[in-house]
UniProtKB/Swiss-Prot annotation:
Keywords: Mitochondrion, Ribonucleoprotein, Ribosomal protein, Transit peptide. Component of the mitochondrial ribosome (mitoribosome), a dedicated translation machinery responsible for the synthesis of mitochondrial genome-encoded proteins, including at least some of the essential transmembrane subunits of the mitochondrial respiratory chain. The mitoribosomes are attached to the mitochondrial inner membrane and translation products are cotranslationally integrated into the membrane. Coiled coil: none annotated. Present with 1340 molecules/cell in log phase SD medium. Residues 1-26 form a transit peptide. It comes from Saccharomyces cerevisiae (strain ATCC 204508 / S288c). It is found in: Mitochondrion. This is Small ribosomal subunit protein uS7m. Disulfide bonds: none annotated.
Length: 247
């Protein structure tokens, strides 16, 4: 305890206020080697630099051309320096890349099919979660097929979606009419996606994104059981083709 007290008495901070800045200097009995720079000298230089900046800001208006000038020069032209930096010549490799990519069309910012699928996955307004699920599923499709997952998704929906549905209409007599009705693209995608989700829920994985990715891969390979539903709907529509009303 006495040793700690003596040590505390030997090393005491002495606060110095210089130009509004508090600097703590320690009085120690330990001598520093002459080769090492003094800490107090560095503090003094730092305070002098701060005072010079304060005098410069208070004496006149701040001008970047003057303050940013290199030593030995009173003023620098910032506009000329920025223009000189913008004159960059592309390399031969960059020019070759430009020629190769010049004819490639820029992809659209949004994909209507992806937005539609994301909205059908979304529950309780959690769109970011739906986008994450779809992204993971498409990544699994890419890992297993090594194809563009968006094109694979659009192709799978187009092949799986039915062209028409049958609707029952009351004719006013005892027998009702079953009439085939054509579907637009949005209706076809919705029906196909519902079949994909139903088939995906029958898989064993506990992660919905994994089940969805496996089902999309099966559809891309043509081995999904959802094609049976499409064929059954088409058979029913063909059987009732006599009731189609042409305008």
């Amino acid at each position: 305890m006495l040793h700690c007290a003596r040590r505390y008495m030997l090393v005491r901070p002495r606060l110095l206020w210089q130009s509004g800045t508090c600097v703590a200097r320690f009085q120690s009995s330990v001598r520093t080697p002459a080769s090492e720079p003094s800490a107090e000298k560095g503090v003094d230089e730092w305070l002098e630099a701060i005072n010079e900046l304060r005098e410069e800001f208070s004496a006149k208006e701040y001008l970047p051309e003057t303050s940013l000038a290199p030593p030995g020069q009173s003023k620098v032209d910032l506009l000329q320096g920025s223009q000189a930096g913008s004159k960059i010549k592309p390399t031969a490799e960059q020019l070759a890349q430009w020629e190769a990519l010049k004819s490639v069309p820029i992809p659209p910012r949004k994909n209507a099919t992806l937005d539609h699928i994301t909205n059908m996955i979304m529950r309780h307004g959690k769109k970011e979660k739906a986008q994450t699920i779809l992204s993971r599923a498409l990544y699994l499709v890419y890992c297993q097929t090594r194809q563009d997952p968006i094109q694979a998704l659009e192709k799978s929906l187009d092949e799986l979606a039915p062209l028409m549905m049958t609707k029952t209409f009351n004719t006013g007599v005892a027998k009702a009419s079953v009439i085939p009705v054509p579907l637009n693209k949005r209706q076809r995608n919705r029906i196909a996606w519902n079949w994909i989700v139903q088939s995906a829920n029958q898989r064993v994985s506990s992660d919905f994104a994994v089940r969805l990715g496996e089902e999309l891969t099966a559809i891309a390979k043509g081995t999904s059981s959802a094609f049976e539903k499409r064929d059954q709907i088409h058979k029913t529509a063909i059987a009732h083709r006599a009731y189609i009303q042409l305008k």
